[in-house]
């Protein structure tokens, strides 16, 4: 580059999910090493997702060591927690999701405001068939295809360990390692970034679907303060958390005054 060259780059290393296609997250992370006098502006306000979703996703991505440090804040407040459902099997998960979709539609949510995400298309086949049978046109995408998209309500299915889950078994794929030299830790971090991308597609409500006894290890990285867990498919899910109406801080049920802003708590 010459002295008069002007270079402008935009990117988010936290959403780098195409390493299997040859992309390299180091282009963003090490940008300042290659261009020492670069001026870096970090966009740290999330206008899409609620506070609980943003804080949960921040915690998940914090487990990655190789990243640009950022502190992302949410512009939206909400009482709704992230729902984690652990079914006994895939049929349990299907029943739970169908039941929740019916409830959401009754609440006034539109079909195109609900998005189902998954790693591989075949995971969604039973859901597609069920929704088609009930004449429900619900949006669905693979997580990679959903990058850049958003929806009021997001369901992420297939959050289990092993093949096709999170993290996926392809991390140990010998053919992949022949094509491209693979570092296990860095590939694991890309898997976590994929999970981060999935979580942050949700604007208002997020449902994480797993199987009892085979939960994705990434689910354990979300603090329980942001989630409500259930394993009964047709049981109403209490997914709200008490917050101060003035400062939006999380509160305990028995508090009568917000300890942060001294606002009186009313039911």
Question: What is the meaning of each model-derived region?
Answer:
Residues 10, 43-45, 53, 81-92, ...:
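Conserved RecA-like ASCE P-loop NTPase motor core of nucleic-acid helicases/translocases
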Residues 71-73, 142-145:
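Short, solvent-exposed loop/turn elements at beta->coil junctions and helix N-caps
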Residues 2, 36, 109, 203, ...:
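Short conserved AdoMet
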């Amino acid at each position: 580059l010459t002295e008069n060259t002007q270079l402008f780059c935009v990117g988010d290393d936290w959403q780098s999910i195409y390493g299997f296609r040859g992309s390299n997250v180091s282009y963003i992370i090490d940008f300042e090493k290659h261009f020492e006098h670069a001026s870096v502006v970090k966009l740290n306000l999330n206008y899409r997702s609620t506070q609980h979703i943003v804080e949960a996703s921040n915690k998940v991505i914090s487990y990655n060591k190789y990243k640009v440090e950022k502190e992302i804040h949410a512009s939206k407040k909400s009482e709704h927690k992230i729902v984690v459902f652990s079914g006994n099997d895939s049929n349990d998960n299907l029943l739970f999701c169908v039941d929740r979709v019916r409830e959401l539609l009754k609440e006034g949510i539109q079909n195109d405001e609900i998005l189902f995400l998954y790693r591989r298309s075949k995971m969604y086949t039973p859901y597609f068939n069920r929704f088609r049978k009930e004449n429900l046109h619900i949006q669905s995408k693979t997580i990679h295809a959903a990058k850049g998209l958003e929806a009021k309500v997001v369901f992420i299915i297939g959050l289990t360990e092993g093949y096709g889950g999170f993290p996926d078994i392809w991390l140990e794929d010998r053919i992949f390692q022949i094509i491209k030299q693979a570092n296990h830790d860095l590939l694991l971090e890309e898997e976590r970034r994929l999970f981060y991308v999935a979580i942050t597609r949700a604007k208002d409500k997020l449902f994480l679907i797993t199987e009892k006894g085979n939960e994705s290890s990434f689910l354990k990285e979300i603090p329980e303060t942001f989630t409500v867990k259930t394993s009964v498919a047709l049981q109403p899910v209490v997914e709200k958390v008490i917050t101060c109406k003035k400062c939006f801080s999380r509160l305990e049920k028995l508090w009568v005054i917000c300890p942060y802003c001294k606002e009186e708590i009313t039911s």
